[in-house]
Amino acid sequence: MRRDVRILLLGEAQVGKTSLILSLVGEEFPEEVPARAEEITIPADVTPEKVPTHIVDYSEAEQTEEELQEEIHKANVVCVVYDVSEEATIEKIRTKWIPLVNGRTATGPRLPIILVGNKSDLRPGSTIEAVLPIMSQFPEIETCVECSAKHLRNISELFYYAQKAVLHPTAPLYDPEAKQLRPACAQALTRIFRLSDQDLDHALSDKELNAFQKSCFGHPLAPQALEDVKRVVCKNVAGGVQDDRLTLEGFLFLNTLFIQRGRHETTWTILRRFGYSDSLELTPDYLCPPLYVPPGCSTELNHRGYQFVQRVFEKHDQDHDGVLSPTELESLFSVFSVAPWGPELLHTVPTEAGCLSLRGYLCQWTLVTYLDVQHCLAHLGYLGYPTLCEQDSQAQAITVTREKRLDQEKGQTQRSVLMCKVLGARGVGKSAFLQAFLGHSLGEARDRDAPEKLPTHTINTVRVSGQEKYLILCEVNADSLLDTSLDTTCDVACLMFDSSDPETFVQCATIYKRYYMDGQTPCLFISSKADLPEGVAPPGLSPAEFCRRHRLPAPASFSCLGPAQSSIDVFTQLATMATFPHLAHTELHPTPFWLRGVLVAVGTAVAAVLSFSLYRVLVKSR
């Protein structure tokens, strides 16, 4: 909604433009009227809409054509004033003033116009019949108000309607010739209806209607008012109410009725509560609210975010089988301008029988939040998060983690989402490794309507010390790393080489020395294609010797043809190293972390006992 309103008064000389302004401000009819009033600003706190309002007078005798066009350009609404006792001033509306205001606007939005019949005290009856043909000819005319500056009649109402024409315009919502909602308005209201239909039965129950009413207007409807609304709909729209529930047709009819009765601010309140601008598009401020993410921090959904997206899943899982079929997924996407996720989704997250499971769905939300939080905020906005959850913005569904440097200092991360970069030469098996993380063999992945190129990210859940973590695998080709300084930041690095091609290990060793050797990121070398015979090693350190010398864990083995448990163990090891980065460089043998912790504790206790015994011996020897 606009932050201020600029009203311009036009009309023939002596119709009372200046008197109207001075009567509004002084609350009495002025005895002496200047040729033109100075621009007046009415503060927000004394206007019905709580918006500062600038009122500008025009005098044809004092101002030039260029000055008039400049004022028209700056105005938000124009009041064309005529004298109800002078029919010639009515005719000038059609022949002179409206062409001056909007005559140069062939297409696009036109300035809203209010017709103002002044001096109603000089004529009995009304001139509305005379101006109706003009109102029919020019759809930009919002309304006509008859008033009297001398008797202070309808002065406040005149400027209220002018404000209303700017803040709650009719033109974007309603086609007066067709007497129906414009397509963009009907589309926006249809989306709002779908968001408010929590059980997806294509109708709003009393409970859903009251939740909608409270979200938009701050209070529920009284039971009798609710019944009256449904009675009006039943009377006017076949199928507007079914099984005592308001259908989409009934919902659209109600909004049409509001507009036809001059209550279009009601429809605008609904639209703006769900993020729409005056052009009936979701505003950038609504879709992408401010969220500051300092360097070294990451973004995750918090409990409010996960609860909301899980409710959305359950709403669209109409057969309650725990997965979203393609049809159910299409239903979920219906409130978006374009589908947020493409066919690569089924090769990015865990699935069940080719359908999106709840776990995979939550994984996808987690991935988007981590990789591109602005897209996550927009997606939550399309789903109506701020309105349905009664929150200020989607940013309240996001947690910004503490800096990675602090995690490294404390020796443990509080993050629930961990990033693993999988680095290696082309052909070493990185894509197979990523798909194995989802429980797919590479052959299965390529047979299941896969996109031409498999995604470079996959995500799944892993348990670390009894806690569930989300682990993201990101595939990076070693060739690009050796040529350019790409972002190698991650929680754990997985350096993959082909056990049958020793040259690929040399590349991994080079990457390690260049990017990770002097840092604190834990690294794990993985020997892929472990089912193939080992190649002839070139002169130099073997992978095991290299890892031992650099105080790294022993290389792990992986084969897409190997047992599933060995793959799970590798992913668990990566997640554990990311969670406890300070332990990674002391891991010279495949001893489990929990066992090493026990051994350290036992060793400490034994040392304490020996120290105490030695002390007693020394005391006795004295």
Curated annotation (Swiss-Prot):
<keyword id="KW-0832">Ubl conjugation</keyword>
<feature type="domain" description="EF-hand 1">
    <location>
        <begin position="184"/>
        <end position="219"/>
    </location>
</feature>
<dbReference type="InterPro" id="IPR013566">
    <property type="entry name" value="EF_hand_assoc_1"/>
</dbReference>
<dbReference type="GO" id="GO:0003924">
    <property type="term" value="F:GTPase activity"/>
</dbReference>
<feature type="binding site">
    <location>
        <position position="199"/>
    </location>
    <ligand>
        <name>Ca(2+) 1</name>
    </ligand>
</feature>
<feature type="binding site">
    <location>
        <position position="201"/>
    </location>
    <ligand>
        <name>Ca(2+) 1</name>
    </ligand>
</feature>
<feature type="binding site">
    <location>
        <position position="431"/>
    </location>
    <ligand>
        <name>Mg(2+) 2</name>
    </ligand>
</feature>
<feature type="topological domain" description="Cytoplasmic">
    <location>
        <begin position="1"/>
        <end position="596"/>
    </location>
</feature>
<feature type="binding site">
    <location>
        <position position="317"/>
    </location>
    <ligand>
        <name>Ca(2+) 2</name>
    </ligand>
</feature>
<feature type="transmembrane region" description="Helical; Anchor for type IV membrane protein">
    <location>
        <begin position="597"/>
        <end position="619"/>
    </location>
</feature>
<dbReference type="Pfam" id="PF00071">
    <property type="entry name" value="Ras"/>
</dbReference>
<keyword id="KW-0479">Metal-binding</keyword>
<dbReference type="GO" id="GO:0019725">
    <property type="term" value="P:cellular homeostasis"/>
</dbReference>
<feature type="binding site">
    <location>
        <position position="17"/>
    </location>
    <ligand>
        <name>GTP 1</name>
    </ligand>
</feature>
<feature type="binding site">
    <location>
        <position position="197"/>
    </location>
    <ligand>
        <name>Ca(2+) 1</name>
    </ligand>
</feature>
<dbReference type="Pfam" id="PF08356">
    <property type="entry name" value="EF_assoc_2"/>
</dbReference>
<comment type="function">
    <text>Atypical mitochondrial nucleoside-triphosphatase (NTPase) involved in mitochondrial trafficking. Probably involved in control of anterograde transport of mitochondria and their subcellular distribution. Can hydrolyze GTP, ATP and UTP.</text>
</comment>
<dbReference type="InterPro" id="IPR011992">
    <property type="entry name" value="EF-hand-dom_pair"/>
</dbReference>
<feature type="cross-link" description="Glycyl lysine isopeptide (Lys-Gly) (interchain with G-Cter in ubiquitin)">
    <location>
        <position position="119"/>
    </location>
</feature>
<feature type="cross-link" description="Glycyl lysine isopeptide (Lys-Gly) (interchain with G-Cter in ubiquitin)">
    <location>
        <position position="164"/>
    </location>
</feature>
<dbReference type="InterPro" id="IPR013567">
    <property type="entry name" value="EF_hand_assoc_2"/>
</dbReference>
<feature type="binding site">
    <location>
        <position position="19"/>
    </location>
    <ligand>
        <name>GTP 1</name>
    </ligand>
</feature>
<feature type="binding site">
    <location>
        <position position="118"/>
    </location>
    <ligand>
        <name>GTP 1</name>
    </ligand>
</feature>
<feature type="binding site">
    <location>
        <position position="208"/>
    </location>
    <ligand>
        <name>Ca(2+) 1</name>
    </ligand>
</feature>
<feature type="binding site">
    <location>
        <position position="119"/>
    </location>
    <ligand>
        <name>GTP 1</name>
    </ligand>
</feature>
<keyword id="KW-0106">Calcium</keyword>
<dbReference type="InterPro" id="IPR001806">
    <property type="entry name" value="Small_GTPase"/>
</dbReference>
<dbReference type="GO" id="GO:0005509">
    <property type="term" value="F:calcium ion binding"/>
</dbReference>
<feature type="binding site">
    <location>
        <position position="16"/>
    </location>
    <ligand>
        <name>GTP 1</name>
    </ligand>
</feature>
<keyword id="KW-0342">GTP-binding</keyword>
<dbReference type="InterPro" id="IPR018247">
    <property type="entry name" value="EF_Hand_1_Ca_BS"/>
</dbReference>
<feature type="binding site">
    <location>
        <position position="429"/>
    </location>
    <ligand>
        <name>GTP 2</name>
    </ligand>
</feature>
<feature type="binding site">
    <location>
        <position position="475"/>
    </location>
    <ligand>
        <name>Mg(2+) 2</name>
    </ligand>
</feature>
<comment type="similarity">
    <text>Belongs to the mitochondrial Rho GTPase family.</text>
</comment>
<keyword id="KW-1000">Mitochondrion outer membrane</keyword>
<keyword id="KW-0677">Repeat</keyword>
<feature type="binding site">
    <location>
        <position position="149"/>
    </location>
    <ligand>
        <name>GTP 1</name>
    </ligand>
</feature>
<dbReference type="InterPro" id="IPR020860">
    <property type="entry name" value="MIRO_dom"/>
</dbReference>
<feature type="binding site">
    <location>
        <position position="328"/>
    </location>
    <ligand>
        <name>Ca(2+) 2</name>
    </ligand>
</feature>
<dbReference type="InterPro" id="IPR002048">
    <property type="entry name" value="EF_hand_dom"/>
</dbReference>
<feature type="binding site">
    <location>
        <position position="150"/>
    </location>
    <ligand>
        <name>GTP 1</name>
    </ligand>
</feature>
<feature type="binding site">
    <location>
        <position position="121"/>
    </location>
    <ligand>
        <name>GTP 1</name>
    </ligand>
</feature>
